[in-house]
């Protein structure tokens, strides 16, 4: 049986992991640590958190397989896209999906990311 590595706890809760690694794949969740009322700014911060968490797990954004994006106002998706376009590795484009969702507190965006660790 292959082992599961849990990295954490999350900065939001001592009962959640920041990332989980299993079978050469890491899954991580990120929100913005700044709760400014700008989807663009929160997205930039959350994407930076993703990058840090991937590095902590032993991988990088060029190895991302899939990003599930949750935003509070789907009509503001172009703001997320602007942050994404500035951040994404254009030579290794991952799959992504974006849905509107009710999020906790002042969060405007939440990202669920899976990435490969093994080459």
Segments from the language model and where they lie:
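N-terminal presequence-like segments and the immediate start of the first folded domain
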Residues: 1-65, 71-119
